[in-house]
Amino acid sequence: MNRKSADFFFKIGGNADIFVKLKSVEQIEKTIETTRKIGVPLKFIGNGSNILVKDEGIRGVVAKICTSTYDFIDETTLRLDSGLLNAKVARILLDHSLAGFEFASGIPGTLGGAVKMNAGAYGSEMKNIVVSTRYIDLDSDKIEIKEINNAEHEFSYRHSIFSNKNAIIIDTTLRLQTGNKGEIEEKLCNNLDNRRAKQPIDKPSAGSTFKRGEDFITAQLIDECG
């Protein structure tokens, strides 16, 4: 299936030669195996909410990760597929009165993308709730699922080991806290209202474009430039 990159968040860019949606680990593994066998380039994406595509498009196969299952390990710990949208994860956790993910509910994109960039907002970030992540190393000749713990993610500001690693995240295990459902929902609503007030969420936008400086506010510098 040919897919226009302009269908994604920024509404720009050329077509992908072949566009597929992958809904299981088996489909992910088979796609890697097949493209390697026939020598076709393969590019994985999440929700397409944090990428810019050139007008010439993308050669080869673009595979969108659409996995969407989750399993509880115990009352406050669960493993979630990387293809789940952050908004969906927030809803799942709200339904089970689990707190700790509210900060990410309005961040566009998938859980896999949030882990990759150590997404954060309102004083919280993914490194605070990630237990482990399973992934496939695309530089390895062998197609196998590996797992790393929290420390091995090498989390830092908007960065993880996956930022510079050619890998596809399969799923992530999160540990949350038992909370009050009403309070969690109120926090979710407040965070979303705050985003609506400060960001043009009805326009092509991926939220923040620039990293925060250590001793300056990026937005202030842009304003001062005129």
Q: Where in the sequence are the language-model features?
A:
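Non-catalytic surface loops within mature trypsin-like serine protease
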Residues: 67, 82, 137, 176-178, ...
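Phosphate/pyrophosphate- and phosphate-bearing ligand-binding catalytic cores of soluble enzymes
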Residues: 9, 51, 142-226
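Anion-binding (especially nucleotide phosphate/pyrophosphate-binding) glycine-rich loop
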Residues: 1-111, 115
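Contiguous, small/hydrophobic- and glycine-enriched helical/loop subdomains that border
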Residues: 72-77, 81, 86-87, 100, ...
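Short, well-ordered alpha-helical segments in soluble proteins
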Residues: 93, 111, 115-119, 134-137, ...
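Conserved active-site and cofactor/substrate-binding residues in soluble primary-metabolism enzymes
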Residues: 23-26, 84, 88, 124, ...
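A generic local secondary-structure boundary/capping motif
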Residues: 51, 90-93, 102-105, 118-125, ...
